[in-house]
């Protein structure tokens, strides 16, 4: 499903998408990946995203699901960047593990050294929209900006709640010279109506309007990204 800038914060983003709503078995799958020392579960989320969002065929290597490369993929993402972790004690970054299968399926390089979290603040879970915005303000910075210049970037996160985190990441990437940033996550939380009333950073970048959230994901509802 494509996310709407009328319902989520998509400041400085060309757009955003997630195949599922964050509830039921989807929520349990994300929590397993995040809180049960299960990096393999995070990679399976990425395999599912490659299949649902890009049409990658899933094959099994033993008990491990793997995405096949997407033939004829020519969208033009030049870099895949995971949202940096807020909890370094976990030992692995869930979005980075999710991004690995996507990188393999699309043939797009995955980089973990270009977008950095420079301050560790409160977890975003349970915060209001205003608290989330304050919490991520100045939380990210870029490294090696010459490697970001004029690049079309695919940003990966596990869950998009209000869009505050992905918007903050996109903001610093564009400031570093990136051409465009598109965000994808495994799931999205039902949006808060107030999200669209918050002003974006005033650096001249705008966000195009997208269609409203689709009612429910279908396995054959692939996106032409």
Question: Where are the predicted features?
Answer:
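Glycine-rich phosphate/pyrophosphate-handling loop used in enzymes and phosphotransfer proteins
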Residues: 1-156, 161-225
């Amino acid at each position: 499903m494509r996310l709407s800038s009328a319902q989520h914060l998509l400041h400085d983003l060309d757009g955003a998408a997630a195949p599922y709503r964050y509830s039921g078995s989807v929520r349990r799958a994300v929590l397993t990946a995040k809180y049960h020392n299960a990096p393999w579960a995070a990679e399976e989320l990425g395999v599912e995203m490659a299949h649902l969002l890009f049409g990658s065929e899933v094959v099994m290597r033993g008990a491990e699901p793997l995405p096949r490369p997407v033939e004829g993929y020519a969208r033009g993402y030049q870099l895949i960047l995971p949202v940096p972790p807020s909890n370094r004690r976990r030992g692995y970054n869930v979005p980075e593990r999710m991004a690995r299968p996507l990188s393999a399926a699309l043939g797009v390089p995955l980089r973990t050294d270009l977008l950095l979290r420079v301050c560790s603040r409160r977890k975003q879970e349970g915060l209001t929209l205003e608290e989330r915005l304050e919490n991520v303000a100045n939380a990210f910075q870029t490294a090696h900006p010459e490697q970001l210049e004029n690049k079309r970037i695919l940003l990966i996160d596990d869950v998009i709640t209000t869009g505050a985190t992905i918007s903050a990441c996109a903001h610093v990437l564009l400031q570093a010279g990136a051409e465009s940033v598109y965000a994808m996550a495994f799931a999205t939380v039902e949006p808060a109506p107030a999200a669209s009333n918050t002003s974006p950073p005033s650096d001249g970048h705008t966000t195009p309007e997208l269609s409203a959230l689709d009612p429910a994901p279908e396995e054959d509802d692939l996106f032409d990204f």
